[in-house]
Amino acid sequence: MGPLSILTIIFIAVVIDLLFGELPTNIHPVVFIGRIIEIFKKLKERYSLINTRIAGAFLTIFLIILLSWIFAFIIWIFKFNNLLMIIISSILLSTTFSIKLLINSADNVKIDINHDIDNARKSVSYLVSRDTSQLSYEKIISAVIETLTENITDSVVSPIFYTFILGVLGGIAYRVVNTLDAMIGYKNPKNINIGW
């Protein structure tokens, strides 16, 4: 695909995400990735330190290859018609974005914070991993801004960048690595020995 096709796919994918948001969880590729990572996390307890490190590296490579192969196959099926291929590629790429979800989540906090701070705390808890039960008005606003700033990079700018540079499969590979980072990339006691 040429640069114009890639730009068209990116544009359509963003529009799809803005209009429709996330796919249902039972068919969402990121949820599929997450399930495989969860299975790995349960199995890793059986491995020695070196095997856990090797398995973590293998998991990364395996997921990138698996998802890239699945998406490439789906795109290839529609290669006979360029317009269909662009539409299907756009739908697949839209799964790497979370623009509408981010906007809606921030809007929910904005609405809640003006009416009920406890509801605002609960709404912001869906955006951050920290304890939100005692956050003040200012801390809630700060948490939303921090989350939006980080997630604009993770869920908008980076998928677009990698897709533009490496094509649709580059955007997909980015989302795999980003999901791995979010789920097992933190150097806490549970994840310290996964990969290097």
Question: Which residues fall in each region the model found?
Answer:
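Hydrophobic alpha-helical transmembrane segments
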Residues: M1-A173, V177, G185-W196
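Glycine-rich phosphate/dinucleotide-binding loop and adjoining beta-alpha-beta core of small-molecule
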Residues: A182
